[in-house]
């Protein structure tokens, strides 16, 4: 009788197990309901409660269910993996199980990447999905992190081969199963730990690619100073590893973009800057500083960026060979693996197992003998292109960061610019046919093509390098620098100090400097080319800052002005981005330069051409206002000069005559103020506000400011909306004070580009915002009382 309670307890326990089993099989002991287990596992994955792992089922149960659901035996394999991967395991059997799991997932991943849906449709549920649902991802994370656990003072170890298998399986699961990458990204300790796996060459490629994918979806940017022994880790990378590492760095040193257009407004940016000042440096800034503190880091990047590729393979065979391999180029890791097969024959059996095609021919992939025979110079060139675009991106971001001057000095010292000049024709802007390779799933004009991306990244780097920095003259060679000096001497003006201070040992060598090479390809670029925008931006950055007559003449002598006018007028360019970049460049090229206006008038030599030009200007003032500003400033200077050459240009130039008319200036002024509002101001359109201020500052110099304000008031009334324009302008000027009085760089740029002291800018704004309604130069004097709305709060918290 004493045993009865125990028996009853045992029966109750057995009943609970049966009930649980019945629930798992669909709530009763009969035939299982399809999908019910997977649903419960999915709920458990989301909540952390209930069914979450294969170990919660018996092997018999899983085997029976597998017959119906076709799970490829993955849950049973996971059950064995749990049993053989405990802390005291020797991991021998564990590794053999991983070898069984890997091909089940890798074939699926290959089908996913190559968009071969036929393979995945054969199973009810993808293998990667089943693997994750039964707890495979979490288990592999635990296995990989075993070395962080100590038992009796000794840290556990797992082999590189086993780590490699785990990483490949994780990567394939991330590729095929939605949400896995994000879950891994939330495990910050795991993400940091992954960096330590890059110390081994055997696991480097798999680790780097997995980290890259994880960081791409991580909500908060990782801090590199939390990576153990970062300096030692990076310093020990060989050049190939460092180039791969740049793919990761691209994510860690760039400020995160919210993707919300509203966040790009200057109001939001100013609010964010105030917040950042209280919080200290951003994670991206901390990461940049961490990298720059690593000895030799920038020097090694410069060497990578300028490393040459053997030219033993001709262009035609290069393209033909690449077309046979295009499906592999979607994934940089696959490309690295192929390179490894080609270059390290002795290691071909250890090629990364992200996809089985890199394994044996029996698995339906490339036989090693075929890979070694067919992986030619073409793949090496593409490999180098993909490396260089990542390296150039990192250098570009560092050039725009807080340590800009430090990076500039190092880039100059390590001869990045002359090195890129030597690569320009053979790699960066090499000739290729219309059948050039594009990535799988893209077209020839897609900016994702490695060739195209490299060109754009190269142009962005030149833009960042030249922008408002004296080192821009390193883009020239010695002969071209001498030409600048000769231009100054002939014009009887002082030679540019930065030219005199340029270290001639660091400039470009050869017959042409990098700037001249860029001009040559720019003039040959097809009308519809997307490169036109970036080329114009790069050349314009060379002219930015204090206006240099010698710099302008250097470019004018090479036919740049005629090329720009051809694109604007004769080709009737339709792209707004390209038009804006060409108008900006034209403005910098012509500003204060009498010779440029003479050339302009010679090219635009008919009323018909001039009307086409005006139509392009007036079609979008956001795009053309910088040119309007430069012409207005030039007109003001020319009118105050006593020179026959200047007088001749003033009397003959259609453009100067057009801008000199007060109705023209008022039309521009009215539209410039009307197309912007405080809430919509961005870095792109704030120039409209500054151009309107330039027009009014020049009017103030001539004591005509009240006249211009009175004319604006009349134009308001003619539109039947009294007060709407001047109220808006008042708010814009209030914002201007908040924005520019706290940004030294912006104020310096305004001063240098206009040759008007910033104190005069500030005075003019203060006069316009004067609250005294009796002041003839105050905006409020021209807003009637019933329509006044000047105290609106436009700040964003």
UniProtKB/Swiss-Prot annotation:
Domain of life the protein comes from: Eukaryota
Tissue: Widely expressed, with high levels in heart, liver and testis.
Compartmental location: Cytoplasm, Perinuclear region
Post-translational modification note: Phosphorylated by GSK3B; phosphorylation is required for ubiquitination. Ubiquitinated by a SCF (SKP1-CUL1-F-box protein) E3 ubiquitin-protein ligase containing SKP2, leading to its degradation. Phosphorylation by GSK3B is required for ubiquitination.
GO MF entries: phosphatase binding; ubiquitin-like ligase-substrate adaptor activity
Family annotation (PANTHER family): SHORT TRANSIENT RECEPTOR POTENTIAL CHANNEL 4-ASSOCIATED PROTEIN, TRANSIENT RECEPTOR POTENTIAL CHANNEL 4-ASSOCIATED PROTEIN TCPC4AP
Protein name: Short transient receptor potential channel 4-associated protein
Record gene name: Trpc4ap
